[in-house]
Amino acid sequence: MGKGEFTFNLLCCYNREAETLTNKPVKLLIAASGTGGHLFPAIAIANQLKDYHIEWLGVPDRLETKLIPSQYPLHTISVEGFQQKLGIETLKVLSRLIGSILKVRHILKEGKFQGLFTTGGYIAAPAIIAARYLGLPVILHESNVLPGKVTRWFSRLCNVVAVGFEEGTKYLSFEKTVYLGTPVREEFLFPQSLDLPIPENVPVIVIVGGSQGAVAINQLVRKCIPAWVENGAWIIHQTGENDPNAFSLKHPQYFTLPFYHNMASLFQRANLVISRAGAGSLTELAVTHTPSILIPYPYAADNHQAYNAKIFSNQNAALVFTEGELTPEKLQTEVLELLQSSEKLEKMSLGAESLAVKDSHKKLAGLVHEILSH
């Protein structure tokens, strides 16, 4: 089956009900853990598959224990990263991996699950191996341009790999790789109200550091705030919960928030966003058509955030700077120049829009239906 035919079939099948001989709902296990970039797309898919019985595979004490909706029973296993070099620690990791595989196999078998959907990351390794051992279909979604280690190593065990960026297909030599975009939370697809006392016709800068925050960006930004507010900007700064200096600066036009419940409203209102370059945040910037300044996290695995950011830079959707090259003076100047040029911001907005796949959640749900109906 060719790539085009495969994509056509999965889109056509989305509106079909999941069919079983017993008329019981299809049971699907979703393996997604760790960060918002892994969890939010998986939650979007789960919410789209209302005719399925869905349960979740996660890790204790990770973000999923707080974010996963209560209607999805949560199973937990212990997983950890793979070592770069062979040694005694590698053997320990492999031993624990085998234990995790056996536990996932037990969950899948006892629960009589009919398939696995995963968004990659370390939890995907034992989940994929266990599912394939039992002969169950596996759908893997990779949101980053440069696929993670687990995706690269285990994609051939999957029935299909869906990628969030079209550029990502060239890094996977696997014929059943399809570009479907990355699903976003439903609120990003509809107008949201911002419940902060900000006047309507003022420029708004939003600073975010991903679901974990970014102390380095916070420190950089705080040195620029006085000049920005002096030039009329209002600033919403989501600092994350690990910044000891989060509330060190106060100004009526500056809102400091460790966490904000409705990121969609922030991005929709923002004239400019300053952010890391995680795939989840970039997808949200694309669907809200929001101009951005991106500062890729320099210690991300395989420098994958730089690959994500390059796509936005190539489409004129963002300005991209490394953390090392960006001084407070440079950031201050770049932001003020953008805010003073509606033409530049409009061009960046159109660039972001060109990268959006707003129906990704429907396409990916269609893919799940297609694979599990065979």
From Swiss-Prot:
CDD domains: GT28_MurG (cd03785)
Presence of the UniProt keyword Nuclease in the record: no
Residues binding UDP-N-acetyl-alpha-D-glucosamine, per UniProt: T35, G36, G37, N144, R185, S211, Q305
Any one annotated GO CC term: plasma membrane
Single Gene Ontology BP annotation: regulation of cell shape
InterPro entries the record matches: GlcNAc_MurG, Glyco_trans_28_C, GlycoTrans_28_N
Cellular localisation: Cell inner membrane
Pfam families: Glyco_tran_28_C, Glyco_transf_28
Keywords: Cell cycle, Cell division, Cell inner membrane, Cell membrane, Cell shape, Cell wall biogenesis/degradation, Glycosyltransferase, Membrane, Peptidoglycan synthesis, Transferase
EC number: 2.4.1.227
Cited function: Cell wall formation. Catalyzes the transfer of a GlcNAc subunit on undecaprenyl-pyrophosphoryl-MurNAc-pentapeptide (lipid intermediate I) to form undecaprenyl-pyrophosphoryl-MurNAc-(pentapeptide)GlcNAc (lipid intermediate II).
HAMAP family: MurG
Record family assignment: Belongs to the glycosyltransferase 28 family. MurG subfamily.
Protein's UniProt name: UDP-N-acetylglucosamine--N-acetylmuramyl-(pentapeptide) pyrophosphoryl-undecaprenol N-acetylglucosamine transferase
Species assigned in the record: Trichodesmium erythraeum (strain IMS101)
